[in-house]
From Swiss-Prot:
Disulfide bonds: none
Localization annotation: Cell membrane
Tissue expr: Expressed in root epidermis, parenchyma of stele tissue and primordial of the lateral root, root-shoot junctions and leaf sheaths. Expressed in germinated embryonic tissue, young tillers, flower organs and pedicels.
Transmembrane annotation, as ranges: 64-84, 101-121, 188-208, 226-246, 258-278, 305-325, 335-355, 382-402, 427-447, 459-479, 482-502, 513-533
Topology feature Cytoplasmic, residues: 1-63, 122-187, 247-257, 326-334, 403-426, 480-481, 534-781
Segments on the Extracellular face: 85-100, 209-225, 279-304, 356-381, 448-458, 503-512
Name assigned to this protein: Potassium transporter 5
Species: Oryza sativa subsp. japonica (Rice)
């Protein structure tokens, strides 16, 4: 079997010294077909599908903006419940400090969520999807920095894979790209930074429900003054337990109500803010003058800096604007923030500041104290509902991130259940759900007040925002057409502000600030260990792949039985024959009548059209009916159930055989193994049409497939009736004998402990046990 690509040491296709530079321009156009058995060339024949970035009408945009209010802005919208109490933990000594803090809140909200995220970060999306993984995937597609060496040149021909390369500053970008690709340390650091950010966001799935529900329920003290803080925490815990227990039902059926509830919440807090402003002190509007920030720090010094740990809570949930972008679009998120959230929360804070100028002693319960008596109970009910919705959004976000991490080989196997037929990103993970529930209950029971939880929450919020700043800076340098001046200003202004806030949050490390770091350290260790072994397991298969002549040798063996039916042999290896095949033949001297060696591969892209998913090739000799198949998914794609997957593979295999038969009769002779990409054959690009037209003009009889092709398709159809058997490798990974002590601990004990305590592959794929054959093999890495 002749491989179309030669893999270099870093897993990419070997090219000349100038090829990488030139390839940046060729990603945007389909390379003209040179030969019909070229996987690299044939991958470009399919027209791209529609992405999130496609232009939509204003009616659709406004509808999406309304939906985003309930999904994206619940967390940031509930911040007025606890910001002032978390900032003035020791009370208000000077009422002028209220103006200083109010000014800090105004310009923090304007600088980070509005300017940084709405106008800059949202542009760094991956075909309409956002979040840390989206940024990492953008950088990974532009520069080969993946730690798993399974890149193929044809990956760049996937429609959503294409990037707009910087034309006017391509030399600078190319120089940085080369440095990144040639630096193993940079690849590792970038990966660790990415999983640190994702770990922090997953940790928010613990902290957001705690602080949101606890602060909302705390308002009941205004009506039931006899309740102790412990009893209030108990009520919050009961609500949290119910919240996690209903996660398995998904939010599809009740999600439509999120928007109206959160919008009602914004109307309540904005209206209350206007009421308090005109009733108590309109002078707080002076806080729009940033001079009061300077006065505040001059007056309070170190204590002013420490209070920033509370101020930063006014932008909790900002990252959700970017992370949830895939469900909406950039314009909808921008409208939702600037038209609804921004004026509502600013009015809420201004109203509370006006109230505190008159009643500074009420700072611990500012929100509920400032509500007019007739609106108390309606506001309380809406506040609890809004807190639950904000918590729901972060829990769902944690599930989605873990699902993405698992797909990219960065998280142990867990069962991902899709709870919505409308939104592919809404998933439920039972194991993670109950872990989050236990952690939420424990944190709420131990800390009981929003002040201490806020100390932890602040670190998590700013840490993720700072990492986003670093990754977007890389995108600006390499991918965007951005001048060096703007590139320098972005991390200096936004990164500088975030570091100041982060330093303040770290000051309260011992008062709860350690929580997100402990969560993140544990998650990072699990993710890094799993990915480390995942990478080395792939490299083991790459080093030990079997000779291309192996199948030809099998074909002449007389004692090798051919079993009825079709066998799907799974391997991560995308090039060559995996070592598990000869191991299987040695233990069970038989092979199915049709054998498809399947590699399921995830690209650093959010989604792949079904018509671009399957790549096939023959393994010589053709008459032996052994095929290689690479099945490509994006990190947000839903994997089909076994029955649907089997049907798709077989139908695309038949289509491949038919197309290969047509191509093989053309004047372009096939050499070695024949390769085709399946899908979209009824709508080829002009290059394929030109080639086909030229071929047909020279040889009219080639428009009909050879007779053997129809026999082969009928044979596969017949074997399909005999059933499909899934052959899953059950690899026992151990450290090689000469490995150092630390590696043996990580591989032999830590990794294997994680593997045994998470789900096994067949439980993830739901393959029926009566059609599953597990093939055991030991890998020494």
């Amino acid at each position: 079997m002749t491989e179309p690509l030669h893999t270099s040491s870093n897993g990419g296709a070997e090219r000349g010294p100038n090829a990488a530079f030139e390839s940046e321009k060729t990603l945007q156009t389909t390379t003209r077909l040179q030969r019909f058995d070229s996987l690299h060339m044939e991958a470009g024949k399919i027209p791209g599908g529609q992405s999130h970035t496609a232009k939509v009408g204003w009616a659709t945009t406004l509808h999406l903006a309304f939906q985003s209010i309930g999904v994206v802005y619940g967390d940031m919208g509930t911040s007025p419940l606890y910001v002032f109490s978390s900032t003035f933990t020791n009370g208000i000594k000077d009422t002028n400090d209220i103006l200083g803090v109010m000014s800090l809140i105004i310009y923090t909200v304007v600088l980070l969520p509005l300017i940084k995220y709405c106008f800059i970060v949202l542009r760094a999306n991956d075909n309409g999807d956002g979040g840390t993984f989206a940024l990492y995937s953008l950088i990974s597609r532009y520069a080969r920095i993946s730690l798993i060496p399974n890149q193929q040149a044809e990956d760049a021909m996937v429609s959503h894979y294409k990037l707009e390369s910087p034309s006017n500053r391509v030399k600078r970008a190319h120089w940085i790209k080369e440095k990144m690709e040639n630096s193993p340390n940079f690849k590792i650091i970038l990966f660790l930074v990415t999983i640190l950010a994702t770990s922090m966001v997953i940790g928010d799935g613990v902290l957001t429900p705690c602080i949101s529900v606890l602060s909302a329920v705390g308002g009941i003290k205004e009506s039931a003054k006899s309740l102790t803080q412990g009893q209030i925490a108990g009520i919050a815990i009961a609500i949290l337990i119910v919240l996690f227990l209903v996660q398995r039902f998904g939010t599809d059926k009740v999600g439509y109500s999120f928007g109206p509830i959160i919008l009602t919440w914004f109307i309540f807090i904005a209206g209350t803010g206007v009421y308090n402003l005109f009733k108590h002190d309109t002078g707080v509007l002076k806080a729009f003058n940033p001079k009061y920030i300077v006065d505040y720090f001059e007056r309070n010094g170190k204590q002013g800096w420490i209070s920033l740990g509370g101020v930063i809570l006014c932008i909790t949930g900002t990252e959700a604007m970017f992370a949830d972008l895939g469900h909406f679009n950039v314009r909808a998120i921008q409208i939702g923030f600037s038209v609804v959230l921004l004026p509502s929360v600013l009015l809420a804070y201004i109203g509370q500041a006006a109230y505190l100028r008159i009643y500074p002693e009420h700072v611990a319960d500012t929100f509920y104290k400032s509500i007019p008596d007739p609106l108390y109970w309606p506001t309380f009910v809406v506040a609890v509902a809004a807190a639950i919705i904000a918590s729901q959004a972060m829990i769902s976000g944690a599930f989605a991130i873990i699902a993405q991490s698992q797909i990219l080989g960065c998280f142990p196997r867990v069962r991902v259940i899709h709870t919505s037929t409308k939104f592919h990103g809404q998933v439920y993970i039972p194991e993670i759900n109950y872990v989050l529930m236990v952690l939420c209950v424990a944190v709420t029971a131990i800390f009981q007040t929003t002040d201490k939880i806020g100390n932890a929450y602040g670190i998590a919020v700013v840490f993720v925002m700072f990492i986003t700043t670093l990754l977007v800076t890389l995108v600006m340098v390499m991918i965007w057409k951005t001048s060096l001046l703007w590139i320098a200003l972005f991390p200096v202004i936004f990164g500088g502000a975030e570091l100041i806030y982060l330093s303040s949050a770290f000051y309260k490390f011992t008062q709860g600030g350690y929580l997100p770091l402990v969560f993140s350290a544990i998650l990072m260790f699990i993710m890094a260990t799993w990915h480390y072994v995942h990478v080395h397991r792939y490299k083991y298969e790459l080093r030990n792949k079997v000779s291309n002549n192996y199948v030809a040798e099998l074909a002449v063996k007389q004692n090798l039985a051919r079993l009825p039916g079709i066998g799907f042999l799974y391997s991560e290896l995308v090039q060559g024959i995996p070592p598990i095949l000869p191991h299987l033949v040695e233990k069970v001297p038989s092979i199915h009548s049709v054998l498809v060696i399947i590699s399921i591969k995830y690209l650093p892209i959010s989604k792949i059209e079904t018509k671009e998913r399957f790549l096939f090739r023959y393994v010589e000799p053709k008459e032996y009916r052994v095929f290689r198949c690479v099945v490509r998914y994006g990190y947000n794609d839903k994997v089909e159930d076994p029955a649907e997957f089997e049907s798709l593979v077989i139908e695309n295999l038949k289509q491949f055989i038919h197309e290969e038969s047509l191509y093989s009769q053309s004047s372009h002779s096939l050499e070695g193994e024949s390769i085709k990409e399946i899908g979209g054959v009824t709508d080829p690009t002009s290059e394929v049409q030109d080639a086909m037209s030229s071929r047909n003009n020279s040889d009219q009889h080639t428009t009909e497939p050879r007779n053997g092709c129809m026999d082969e398709i009928q044979s596969i159809h017949k074997e399909m009736g005999n059933g499909v058997v899934h052959l899953l490798g059950e690899t026992n990974v151990v450290a090689e004998p000469n490995a150092d002590f630390l590696k043996k601990i990580i591989v032999d004990y830590v990794y294997n402990f994680i593997r045994k305590n998470f789900r096994q592959p067949e439980k993830i794929t739901c393959v029926p046990h009566n059609r599953l054959l597990r093939v055991g093999m030991t890998y020494e890495i």
